């Protein structure tokens, strides 16, 4: 007799779906969302925090997808690289970092140039300008004679036209210490693509590596001139400011601390088997990255990764259970690499399906993105009846929210709501329990008080909804399930283990969001098959 299909726990991550009571510029509140509205009216729900110290960031710092998925998968507050590096600068250990000192020494001995590449803003999502200023000070202390800055402008995790201000801040610091120059600028749309759009990356690569000089304008003036043509920070074309191309014998420090958007440019610069576009590999080239972008890259890492043990995916695997992860291209690393604590390889029994994102310049041109295909993949996985845990990310609220286009963001929200209905119907057929949440806010705040487009994340909380499978009750919790208030993303993995009747390891300092019953109920904590 065939085994009954497994009724999975399905974790649905609505990327960028925050909660904000004010409906002004709120794509979520203004959208027609009958599915989410009915869930909030009928099922246990609460709000969880996704920013600041609740996710391992500085107080008041907005969360992001990497941080959110790390905390979701780890079941604990994970200290973030932003804090780790900032603390090192503050306590002085940054200036003793062996990887940074050695690249400076080799460049100095060869009388080469030291190049600093990274996102120039205080957004704190992929980088921080204070880290660049710290590197400039380090170069001065180490006796570097030629320092070249390749500035990547933001406009996504910061307001759309602050790039000129940031490069002026950098230029002032260079002049103050008497070292260095900004030699190129490029919008992150080009230099930090993560969807294998190599034509974009190539433009940034050429400006950084091919000889040339500017036209005499400063970096700030170049950026301001682009503003006058309605080109904002994210989309500034790669532009040469002055002499200082990356060449044989030079050294590079890539100071983004978040890997996903730094990888492709790194591949082009150092990967011997790179084939994204024609280029001659620059050798020798000493290359340091702030954090580990990819274990296969031939680079030196300044801040080695933190090891996270007993995370959710590992526990599920160790129990002999199968799990499934899916998302479209833009968020695929988040449900795999980041959810697994920075591990590239899947755990035993972990299956993955990558859905291609639409090939458009910006996602306001396709607000539906690939939500339908993502839902199809989830439904197929659940129907197999073999997975105890399913993790899915819907990218639409975040990726369309980043465009600052309210009308299109509303369409994105309505697309996700429609597909959520399909997912829930499929889960109901197999008795699955569905947990719906988000990794951070975004689409609930599309413009500031002055009406200017807001393209960054927010510090708002996000919903958490628990939809029990029909006829199912959460083991060990008696009758009606109630969720507690004041939770955070780190509490969701312990909640999943609670539902699956698996013990929560000591490393998981998060606490289940399910309120404990007043009367203790003795429950069999042996893993169970939640089949019908």
Swiss-Prot record:
It holds the Pfam family Metalloenzyme. Gene3D superfamilies: Alkaline Phosphatase, subunit A (3.40.720.10), BPG-independent phosphoglycerate mutase, domain B (3.40.1450.10). Binds 2 manganese ions per subunit. The active site is at residue 65. Keywords: Glycolysis, Isomerase, Manganese, Metal-binding. The keyword Isomerase applies. GO terms for cellular component: cytosol. The keyword DNA damage does not apply. Catalyzes the interconversion of 2-phosphoglycerate and 3-phosphoglycerate. NCBIfam families: pgm_bpd_ind. Belongs to the BPG-independent phosphoglycerate mutase family. This is 2,3-bisphosphoglycerate-independent phosphoglycerate mutase. It comes from Synechocystis sp. (strain ATCC 27184 / PCC 6803 / Kazusa). The lineage of its organism: Bacteria, Bacillati, Cyanobacteriota, Cyanophyceae, Synechococcales.
């Amino acid at each position: 007799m065939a085994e009954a299909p497994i009724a999975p726990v399905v974790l649905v991550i609505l990327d960028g779906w925050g909660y904000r009571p004010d409906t002004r510029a709120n794509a979520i509140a203004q959208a027609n969302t009958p599915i989410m509205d009915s869930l909030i009216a009928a099922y246990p729900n609460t709000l969880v925090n996704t920013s600041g110290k609740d996710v391992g960031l500085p107080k008041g710092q907005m969360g992001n997808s990497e941080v959110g998925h790390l905390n979701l998968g780890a079941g604990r507050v994970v200290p973030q690289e932003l804090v780790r590096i900032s603390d090192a600068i503050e306590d002085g250990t940054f200036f003793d970092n062996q990887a940074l000192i050695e690249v400076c020494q080799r460049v100095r001995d060869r009388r080469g140039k030291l190049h600093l590449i990274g996102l120039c803003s205080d957004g704190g999502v992929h980088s921080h300008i204070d880290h660049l200023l710290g590197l400039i000070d380090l170069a001065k202390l180490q006796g570097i004679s030629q320092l070249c800055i390749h500035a990547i402008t933001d406009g996504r995790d910061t307001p759309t036209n602050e790039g000129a201000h940031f490069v002026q801040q950098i230029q002032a610091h260079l002049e103050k210490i008497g070292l260095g120059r900004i030699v190129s600028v490029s919008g992150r749309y080009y230099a930090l693509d993560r969807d294998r759009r190599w034509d974009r990356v190539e433009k940034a690569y050429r400006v950084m590596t091919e000889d040339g000089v500017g036209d005499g304008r400063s970096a700030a003036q170049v950026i301001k001139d682009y503003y006058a043509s309605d080109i904002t920070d994210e989309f500034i074309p790669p532009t040469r400011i002055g002499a200082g191309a990356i060449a044989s014998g030079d050294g590079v420090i890539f100071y983004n601390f978040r890997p996903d958007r730094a990888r492709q440019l790194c591949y082009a610069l150092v990967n011997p088997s790179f084939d994204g576009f024609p280029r001659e590999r620059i050798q020798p080239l000493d290359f340091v990255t702030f954090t580990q972008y990819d274990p296969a890259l031939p680079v030196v890492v300044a801040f080695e990764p933190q090891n996270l043990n007993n995370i959710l995916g590992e526990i599920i695997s160790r129990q002999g259970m199968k799990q499934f992860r899916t998302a479209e291209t833009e968020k695929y690393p988040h449900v795999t690499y980041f959810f697994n604590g920075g591990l590239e390889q899947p755990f035993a029994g972990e299956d993955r399906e990558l859905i291609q994102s639409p090939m458009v310049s910006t996602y306001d041109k396709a607000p539906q993105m690939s939500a339908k295909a993502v839902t199809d993949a989830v439904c197929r996985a659940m129907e197999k009846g073999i997975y105890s845990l399913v993790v899915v990310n819907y990218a639409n609220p975040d990726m369309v929210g980043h465009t600052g286009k309210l009308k299109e963001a509303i369409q994105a929200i309505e697309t996700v709501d429609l597909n959520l209905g399909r997912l829930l119907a499929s889960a109901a057929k197999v008795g699955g329990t569905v947990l719906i949440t988000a990794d951070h806010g975004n689409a609930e705040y599309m413009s500031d008080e002055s009406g200017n487009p807001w393209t960054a994340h927010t510090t708002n909380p996000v919903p958490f909804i628990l939809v029990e499978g029909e006829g199912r009750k959460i083991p060990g919790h008696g009758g009606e399930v109630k969720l507690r208030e004041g939770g955070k993303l780190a509490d969701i993995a312990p909640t999943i283990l609670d539902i699956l009747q698996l013990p929560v390891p000591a490393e998981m300092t998060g606490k289940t969001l399910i309120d404990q019953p007043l009367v203790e109920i003795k429950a069999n904590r042996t893993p169970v098959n939640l089949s019908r």
